[in-house]
């Protein structure tokens, strides 16, 4: 079982690196820029993106919006939406994309908000099941979203969210950018 998990992690990591390389190529060739807003993933997506040489030509930066204060006061998420739906909802990640694009002056943004788990006694997101993570990619009038709802433990939930976000971004760019020399 341990060897199987190691292989699975290796495959996931390699898959993410290859996708990041393709993202790099698409953004660089199309002279587009990217920013990130990460809550539960805490910078993992930015780390994957910046691990590719040349990412400084298109990646402007990222915001770790772990607290609702950062979501509302810096990235402009409507506090009423968080109060009504929690920070783990589609509307919040869409607003994070818009706020990130405005703040960082980017063409595209990736945003993630979720509850990776496990639940604790002082947890304010307990209304949301562990493993519930929303991802959004896009620009103000063209945002795609993805909801993850599988709890495999905190570490795997975060790794899965990072991988899914990278692939959602790659699919989005492939549909909207001029083709590059990618697989």
Identify the function of each model-found stretch.
Residues 2-183:
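Short alpha-helical segments enriched in small residues
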